[in-house]
């Protein structure tokens, strides 16, 4: 592979990474606590703790089951802690449907929420995209 081709490949990869970050969706996140089974996607299978439930807004008749999403806290809602974000992001797998009355776009496991925000906030603003 020539130098010109390598530069073209690296440039294309960089553009793809930048453009995917630019298309992150915005929403809100809350959290739920164990037990995490059964789940709408996998029944009694233990999927660990880095999981989440999708709201009807992204559920798409279960098409998001077992898909991974990167979630980043972007700020506070008008509830809870004024500066809840801890920095960074978390990778979660959608394994459930957030029940009727769900107050968020994504309902994270308590463990996942705690990695990106102070749980005392209860609800946060997020950016998310499928990983």
Swiss-Prot record:
UniProt-listed InterPro entries: EGC1/2 (IPR044206), Expansin/allergen_DPBB_dom (IPR007112), RlpA-like_DPBB (IPR009009), RlpA-like_sf (IPR036908)
UniProt xrefs under Pfam families: DPBB_1
Principal subcellular localization: secreted
Alphabetized UniProt keyword annotations: Disulfide bond, Secreted, Signal
Signal sequence region: 1-24
Induction entry: By citrus blight. Not expressed in healthy plants.
Cellular component aspect of the GO annotation: apoplast
Domain of life: Eukaryota
Organism: Citrus jambhiri
Positions of the Expansin-like EG45 domain: 27-131
Keyword Disulfide bond set for record: yes
Disulphide bridges: 73-85
Subcellular location(s) of the protein: Secreted
Note: Accumulation of the protein in leaf tissues indicates a systemic mobility.
Function: Might have a systemic role in water and solute homeostasis. Has no expansin-like activity.
Keyword Signal assigned: yes
Tissue: Expressed in the outer layer of xylem and the vascular cambial zone of roots, in shoot cambium, but not in leaves.
Protein name: EG45-like domain containing protein
GO biological process, one term: systemic acquired resistance
């Amino acid at each position: 592979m020539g130098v010109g081709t390598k530069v073209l490949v690296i440039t294309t990869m960089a553009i793809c990474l930048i453009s995917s970050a630019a298309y992150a969706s915005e929403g809100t996140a809350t959290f739920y606590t164990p037990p995490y089974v059964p789940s709408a996607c996998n029944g009694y299978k233990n999927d660990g703790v880095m999981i989440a439930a999708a709201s009807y807004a992204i559920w798409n008749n279960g098409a998001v089951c077992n898909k991974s999403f990167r979630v980043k806290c972007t700020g506070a809602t008008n509830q809870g802690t004024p500066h809840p974000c801890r920095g960074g992001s978390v990778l979660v797998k959608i394994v459930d449907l957030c029940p009727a009355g769900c107050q968020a776009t994504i309902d994270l496991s308590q463990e996942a929420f705690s990695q990106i925000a102070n749980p005392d906030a209860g609800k946060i603003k997020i950016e998310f995209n499928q990983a």
